Amino acid sequence: MIGVLGGTFDPIHFGHLRPALEVFQSIGLTELRFVPLNVAVHRRQPRATGAQRAEMVRVAVQGQTGFRVDENELARPGGSYSYDTLASLREGLGAREPVCLLLGSDAFRHFLTWHRPDAILSLAHLVVMRRP
């Protein structure tokens, strides 16, 4: 099962990493992809460039087996939507590989305002995390 955690990661911090590690270990993910977004649609734009944020994530997760940076979102023009990210991932993986979208409880409170929330649920399971 593959986990996906998107965010600005400007910067990545303990509130991202600790819950992600707990989910990774507790539900037995084989891989956890950290996806830095390109253009924020639900918050202010990041100050660091996409390349800088991807590098911050890469440094933060190095040495943790199964954690990796997915930079596909950074190459996509326009607003960064979880639906588009998951649809692209699902296309590459096929229908059989289970996918989980990890999100903080703060983000989950607004999930129904996201772009195509119903379609997101057809592409991935939701795992809601409480940040430390």
Stretches found by the model and what they are:
Residues 1-132:
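Nucleotidyltransferase catalytic core that binds NTPs
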